[in-house]
Regions:
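Alpha-helical segment of the N-proximal tetratricopeptide repeat
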Residues: 23-52, 56, 131-139, 156-169
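Register position in tetratricopeptide repeats
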Residues: 39-40, 73-74, 106-110
Length: 421
């Protein structure tokens, strides 16, 4: 019996050896399993998968990159140095390998810089390469069951189910269910997010009536809250959400915008609070929610559509105003933009600055326009630098936690360090 099993396994090995594509697929799967285990914190299992892959393909760059990251995560710095040195000899000139090697060196210092600081220093040291076009780190295995499905199986709560939809996406059937149950939403931030979620979408006529009915229900719940709001996001969303995006503003709209611009803040909820709220809701289901899923839900719950609509409608109004009214509207748009730009996220900062730029142009305020353009240039540099690092792709949970926390504390300031002089 044992001999028969041994012969069977040997035949499988020979078949794989004679089929390089099958062998490559198996090795790639082992590496993806290793990355999946890294993400779940099972580093011992990840090392086992990597040892199997490297036994068959000792020169596999992806396996060596993940191995270096696992050793870094474990604090095995000498082994990590050896692994990355081997990787460098096999892949000379690869920018992501250069950054990884510099990261190992940074973390080997005494005292070692924190994960976030170490990566930034490593990236700066090797010339700040753009890793968007670099050879990516291996990816984890795809989920066999969608996150939203796992959450929906555990709860009937509209708020929890909607949070899962924001974190992962949804089917038409799930959207229809939520539309029929939006009356069960109570949290003000989720009410606004749901209203935005059900705004008309181009090319989706099959759900047009469903979206409209959901918005009608949500508007009835939101409108009584508006007088008590000290933030402009809710009133702005209700004012512009239903309108044709390319239509010019009416005088009534302009008066309403002036009132909205007089409110002291744009956001009612910070990214950190939105993250904490989403995490708390998802934890009720006992489904493990990866931090990036929670972050996606938090970001998606912070409404932005009204700001984009405002831009297009203001632009469409330009030719219908007198010079005096144009200056007046420009002042309103500049003020609203400034409120939005006070947010701590990169998105809010850039959206706000774009509206401030438009407002300054309409006011013909040369000094303000020049200042805003400088800030926009800085913001674009920050966005490009953030993208260049490709932090989400690094299989380093400690780095992800540190980066996430800095973003929740103050994303704009934490990313501005990337382009600090």
């Amino acid at each position: 019996m044992l001999q028969r099993a041994y012969r069977f396994l040997l035949s499988l090995w020979r078949r794989a050896a004679s089929n390089p594509e099958a062998l490559q697929r198996r090795i790639d799967a082992q590496i993806s399993r290793a990355v999946t285990n890294v993400g779940s914190g099972n580093l011992a299992r990840a090392r086992l998968e990597l040892s199997k892959a490297l036994e068959e393909a000792p020169r596999h760059p992806g396996a060596l990159k993940v191995q270096t990251c696992v050793l870094l995560e474990l604090g095995a710095l000498e082994e990590a140095s050896q692994a990355v040195a081997r990787l460098q000899s096999l892949t000379p000139g690869q920018p992501e390998v250069a950054v990884l090697a510099a990261l190992v060196e940074q973390r080997s210092q005494t005292p070692a810089p924190d994960w976030r600081g170490a990566l930034i220093q490593a990236w700066n040291r090797v010339g700040r390469p753009d890793l968007v076009e670099a050879e990516p780190f291996p990816s984890p295995l795809p989920d066999t069951t969608a996150f939203v499905e796992r959450v929906w199986e555990r709860t009937q709560s509209p708020e929890v189910r909607f949070t899962a939809m924001l974190a992962d996406g949804a089917s038409d059937a799930q959207r229809q269910w939520l539309a029929a149950h939006v009356a069960g939403l109570e949290d003000a931030a989720l009410l606004l997010a749901a209203y935005e979620y059900f705004l008309p979408r181009s090319g989706e006529d099959a759900l047009a009536d469903v979206r409209r009915q959901a918005r009608e229900t949500l508007r009835r719940k939101i409108e009584p809250l508006i007088p008590r709001m000290h933030e402009s996001e809710g009133p702005l969303l209700l004012l512009l959400g239903e309108s044709a995006k390319e239509a010019s503003l009416t005088q009534e709209n302009i008066h309403a915008l002036e009132r909205i611009a007089g409110l002291p803040r744009y956001r009612r909820t910070s990214l950190a609070q939105a993250y904490a709220d989403a995490k708390q809701r998802l934890e009720l289901t006992a489904v493990t929610a990866p931090p990036l899923r929670v972050l996606q839900a938090a970001v998606a719950s912070m409404v932005t559509d009204a700001v984009v609509i405002l831009w297009t409608r203001v632009e469409a109004t330009k030719e219908h105003l007198s010079a005096e009214d144009r200056v007046r509207l420009g002042r309103t748009v500049f003020t609203l933009g400034a409120r939005i730009a006070e947010g701590a996220t990169l998105s809010d900062r850039m959206l706000g600055l774009r509206h401030m730029e438009l407002g300054a142009e309409w006011m013909a305020d040369v000094e303000k326009l020049a200042q805003v353009k400088r800030e926009l240039e800085h913001g674009r540099a920050v966005a490009e630098a953030s993208s260049a690092l490709q932090v989400d792709s690094w299989p380093l949970p400690s780095l992800h936690r540190a980066w996430l926390q800095a973003s929740l504390d103050d994303e704009w300031n934490s990313l501005s360090i990337l382009v600090a002089p």
